[in-house]
Amino acid sequence: KLDGCCGVKVFVGSSTGTLLVSNHEDIKKIMKSTKKMISFHSEDEDELIKRERFRKKNKPQTHYIWRDVNTALKSTRKLIANANKTKKKIHILHITSAEEVNILKKNKKYVSFEVTPQHLVFSAPSAYKKLGTYAQMNPPIRDSRHKKVLRQALKNNDIDLNNKNITH
């Protein structure tokens, strides 16, 4: 019982402080333990660790290369599978890739998802060149191919929410 709590947010990939829950058995336990909506920041922690070599200090233009599409997609696929197994409704926060949109559109029984305005407006690498670290966020701004698919999905009402805030 979580009095006064409207939902739970889980970071599957490291993003802000020590809020990480990357083990999918633990994620299934969380899903089974509450009737509240659970929202997920969906990036695969193991992939982030493996790809650390692509991260270059003081070079924001490498951010989207390090945190690539596969890092998000791998986590999103696992979350969809867990939602289907547990029959629990979940929400995946700030989707950034065409591949995620395509898989999520086909799996709406237990899963909703959102996009943020900055992922609809900006694209890599130009956003990083122009804005530097101001363009750096998790998951990252991706190239124009993804922006185009996100915009079309929003137009087609495939996206459940348009979130205005991302703080990490």
Regions found by a protein language model. Name each.
Residues 2-10, 16-165:
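Histidine/acidic residue-rich metal-binding segments in metalloenzymes
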